[in-house]
Amino acid sequence: MRSLHQAKGRKEQNLILLEGTHLLQECERLRLEPQLICSTDIWAQRHPCLLQLAPRQIVSPEVLCAMASTENPDGVVSLLAMPSDLTSLPRLDLASKPPLLLALDRVQDPGNLGTLLRTSLAAGVDQVWLGGGADPWQPKVLRASAGAVLQLQLKRWPSLVAGISIAKQSSFQILAAVQRGGRPYWEVDWQLPSVLLLGNEGAGLAAELTDEAQLVTVPHREEVESLNVAVAAGLMLMERNR
């Protein structure tokens, strides 16, 4: 299981490691089928219903700690087949409301990515596109997203430029979040099919992405150089639901 701490191991085995009771509860709620559950005996006695989700193995607390990436696991880890990337854009003619896509350019911090994914689910984002950056299936992202990543449609691109080109041809407006100089986000028509681009924590968005987009910003005091990417995303994504 320790090989699943790394992207190479996850790719080779096509498995992800779920750590903790909450993620297993999410599997139960979403009717996902883990392939294996490993838990301590104490955890098994407390959660007999969750143990019915998959083949199970009782291990010592020491062995469980070796399996997990966290220092103090809560007594259980499980294996789940890695969800597949989506293959197409939302159909505009079939959508009940204009689709909203979030495209993330090289977001590196797993905590930020997990928060972005959780916020995307709360805001009703239809798809999340990832152009490099942190692996959405690493344990830190899974925990930070509180399992939201298991419910989202994800697409990983070698470069977001190709995806943005396809979206423009499909009548999506392209919105690029920048620190300053953009249109205030509340002036944007969020009722149009939209792709919101957010960039790397330090470098921001690649120039080839901003060149193809309308610039939008979250106005803030000059004493603060920039907002955390997840904070800015939350404000803009929730604007659509006002």
Model-derived segments and their meaning:
Residues 175-224:
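Active-site/ligand-binding-proximal alpha/beta "capping" segment
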Residues 59-62, 105, 131-132, 153, ...:
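Short beta->alpha connector loops at strand-helix junctions that form conserved
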Residues 20, 108-115, 226-232:
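Amphipathic alpha-helical repeat scaffolds
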Residues 29, 84-181:
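RNA substrate-binding interface of SAM-dependent RNA methyltransferases
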Residues 78, 119-123, 141-149, 207-242:
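Structured adenosyl-cofactor binding patch, chiefly the S-adenosyl-L-methionine
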Residues 53-81:
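Glycine/small-residue-rich loop that forms an oxyanion/phosphate-binding "nest" at active or ligand-binding sites
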Residues 46, 134-141, 203-208:
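Short, glycine/polar-rich helix-capping loops at beta-to-alpha or helix-loop-helix junctions
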Residues 1-44, 133-134:
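Boundary-proximal intrinsically disordered activation/regulatory segments immediately upstream
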